[in-house]
């Protein structure tokens, strides 16, 4: 069941019967959020973390967010959290207040089922209402699926940091993908 949180998410999807719903994350969702994140670590494509994180380490991360500008949303299907999206502060300085770094993770069993697309559509639909005008994604250059998702939503490569990460002894490049919300011309 979708619930209405500070950002007012969830009710519109549920009322339309549109499948999975997107809603504000709560502390009750932390176990699922952490499990989904930790499932991404072994693949070495979606995060620079190399060891699992704990629910307790994420509790402060969730509590300290300004949900009016930098919320965490979960995508729920059949009562189960199958993905999540976070809006992170970019660089933490006032001049960057309208820019957010997006983090998006999907449960392995729910990948390629439209979960990431649903979360991204919500981000674009509600981003301006959060006071945001620019989204950034920091994506490993070998993460083809995330790059393709971002490209579908109009993200362009704004930076390329060669060999800045070492994962299992392999140097990895990091791409900075960006989009201005008013410039978006693809995925509706």
Identify what each model region corresponds to.
Residues 112-125, 147-152:
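Conserved acetyl-CoA-binding loop-helix of GNAT-fold acetyltransferases
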Residues 86-89, 94, 136-139, 151, ...:
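Conserved catalytic-core motifs of GNAT/GCN5-like acyltransferases
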Residues 52-109, 120, 126, 180-182:
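Acetyl-CoA-dependent GNAT
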Residues 34-62:
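Conserved GNAT-fold acetyl-CoA-binding loop/helix
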Residues 21-33:
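A short beta-loop-alpha structural element at the N-terminal edge
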Residues 127-139:
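Conserved GNAT acetyl-CoA-binding A-motif
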Residues 111, 137-147:
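Conserved beta-strand-loop-alpha-helix junction that forms the acyl-donor binding cleft
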Residues 20, 80-84, 172:
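Glycine-rich phosphate/pyrophosphate-binding loop shared by adenosine-nucleotide-utilizing enzymes
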């Amino acid at each position: 069941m979708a619930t209405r949180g500070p950002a007012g998410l969830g009710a519109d999807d549920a009322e339309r019967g549109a499948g999975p719903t997107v809603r504000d994350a709560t502390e009750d969702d932390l176990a699922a959020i952490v499990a989904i994140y930790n499932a991404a670590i072994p693949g070495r494509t979606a995060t620079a973390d190399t060891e699992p994180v704990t629910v307790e380490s994420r509790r402060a991360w969730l509590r300290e967010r300004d949900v009016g500008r930098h919320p965490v949303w979960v995508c729920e299907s059949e009562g189960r959290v199958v993905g999540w999206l976070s809006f992170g502060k970019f660089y933490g300085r006032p001049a960057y207040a309208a820019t957010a770094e997006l983090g998006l993770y999907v449960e392995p069993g729910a990948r390629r089922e439209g979960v990431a697309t649903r979360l991204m559509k919500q981000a674009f639909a509600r981003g301006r209402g959060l006071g945001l005008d620019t989204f950034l994604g920091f994506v490993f250059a070998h993460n083809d699926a995330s790059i393709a998702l971002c490209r579908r939503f109009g993200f362009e490569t704004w930076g390329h940091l060669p060999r800045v990460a070492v994962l299992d002894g392999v140097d990895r490049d990091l791409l900075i993908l960006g989009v201005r919300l008013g410039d978006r011309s693809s995925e509706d």
